[in-house]
């Protein structure tokens, strides 16, 4: 079964590009352009890798990440940060890298491979996995 990639990206054009790239490479990929939609997608099916835009409106990027790592089976899901701030992955547990526009498809796919190799599905969770409720939609 192909690995599942969740793209959480405010810009629908960027989200569509990333999903298309990942699907063409043989992955199962879906996108959410808003935090609440991303929460629903994780609740429905655990992703193997998340590409996360930290600059979502209403601080949904950090809120989504903080919530996701508390969900059963999601504590070690690797995250690639879509941000202008190189090196930010050093401050975010489970982050395996950052990407910025313009996107290099070879780099994007290499980050997916690295994430999957580093965090094999089924790896025990290290963060608290108490199953925190979904963040408030406000």
From Swiss-Prot:
Residues 4-116 form the Response regulatory domain. The modification 4-aspartylphosphate is found at residues 13, 53. Keywords: Phosphoprotein, Transcription, Transcription regulation, Two-component regulatory system. It comes from the Bacteria. It holds the Pfam family Response_reg. InterPro entries: Bact_response_regulator, CheY-like_superfamily, Sig_transdc_resp-reg_receiver. SUPFAM superfamilies: CheY-like (SSF52172). CDD domains: REC. The keyword Transcription regulation applies. The keyword DNA damage does not apply. One of its GO terms (biological process) is phosphorelay signal transduction system. May be involved in regulation of gene transcription. Belongs to the family of response regulators, and members of this family involved in the regulation of gene transcription are two-domain proteins. This protein contains only the N-terminal phosphorylation domain and not the C-terminal DNA-binding domain but it may bind to Rrf2 protein and the latter may bind to DNA. This is Protein Rrf1. It comes from Nitratidesulfovibrio vulgaris (strain ATCC 29579 / DSM 644 / CCUG 34227 / NCIMB 8303 / VKM B-1760 / Hildenborough) (Desulfovibrio vulgaris). The lineage of its organism: Bacteria, Pseudomonadati, Thermodesulfobacteriota, Desulfovibrionia, Desulfovibrionales.
């Amino acid at each position: 079964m192909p690995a599942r990639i969740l793209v959480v990206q405010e810009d629908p054009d960027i989200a569509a590009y990333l999903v298309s790239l990942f699907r063409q490479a043989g992955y199962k990929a879906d996108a959410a352009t808003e935090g609440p939609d991303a929460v629903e997608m994780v609740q429905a099916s655990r992703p193997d890798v998340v590409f996360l835009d930290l600059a979502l409106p209403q601080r949904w990027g950090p809120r989504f990440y903080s919530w996701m790592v508390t969900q059963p089976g999601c504590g070690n899901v690797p995250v690639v940060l879509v941000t202008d701030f190189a090196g930010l992955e050093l401050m975010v547990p489970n982050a395996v890298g950052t990407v910025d526009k313009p996107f290099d498809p070879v780099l994007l796919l290499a980050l997916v491979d690295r994430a999957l190799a580093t965090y094999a599905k089924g790896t025990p969770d290290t963060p608290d996995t108490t199953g925190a409720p979904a963040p408030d939609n406000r």
